């Protein structure tokens, strides 16, 4: 019974960490990454379609993303969708492939990004703590229903705190790595 509660807590906290990592991948850090264009969809015969379903996306150089559509008639739509994406990226096309050069980040932009990354990690920590609160409420309910003893309640709350601390540490590690990546010139 408590094992199910802990498994649920770990699962939900793991999802919070995964969401943070996904959000971090979408940030433009001055380095080319396929994940920068992951969320972009282009119109293809009237249907919004993910870029990775329309083209081969590669990183030929550290600051360049190359998009090679399988159907060259969709190049114009891909360019429009990249410009509309609010990522601040400018696509250049030669009719066969689209190249996106990632500009070097200024010192001010780097500091702004570090603040954004810090805020995202704090939001993830809040999510993890909210999950801890929910789990502790479940444990208290089990105690009220006499399904567990008082000793088991305190041990369960200690275990919940240990799980929470583990995930907070993981969030800090992910944050530190992203901060280092952003500040790296």
UniProtKB/Swiss-Prot annotation:
GO terms for cellular component: cytoplasm. The gene is frr. This is Ribosome-recycling factor. It is found in: Cytoplasm. One of its GO terms (molecular function) is ribosomal large subunit binding. Its main location: cytoplasm. Belongs to the RRF family. Keywords: Cytoplasm, Protein biosynthesis. HAMAP family: RRF (MF_00040). Responsible for the release of ribosomes from messenger RNA at the termination of protein biosynthesis. May increase the efficiency of translation by recycling ribosomes from one round of translation to another.
């Amino acid at each position: 019974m408590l094992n199910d509660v802990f498994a649920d807590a770990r699962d939900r906290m793991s999802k919070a960490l995964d969401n943070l990592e996904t959000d971090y991948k979408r940030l433009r850090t001055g380095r080319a990454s396929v994940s920068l264009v992951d969320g972009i969809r282009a119109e293809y015969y009237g249907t919004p379609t993910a870029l990775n379903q329309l083209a081969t996306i590669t990183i030929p150089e550290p600051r360049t993303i190359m998009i090679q559509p399988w159907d060259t008639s969709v190049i114009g739509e891909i360019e429009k969708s990249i410009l509309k994406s609010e990522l601040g990226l400018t696509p250049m096309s030669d009719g066969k492939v689209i190249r996106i050069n990632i500009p070097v980040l200024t010192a001010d932009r780097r500091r702004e990004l570090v603040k954004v990354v810090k805020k995202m990690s704090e939001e993830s920590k809040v999510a993890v703590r909210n999950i801890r609160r929910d789990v502790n409420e479940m444990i208290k309910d089990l105690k009220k229903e006499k399904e567990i003893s008082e000793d088991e309640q305190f041990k369960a709350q200690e275990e919940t705190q240990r799980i929470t601390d583990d995930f907070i540490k993981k969030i800090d590690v992910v944050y530190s790595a992203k901060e280092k990546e952003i500040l790296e010139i």
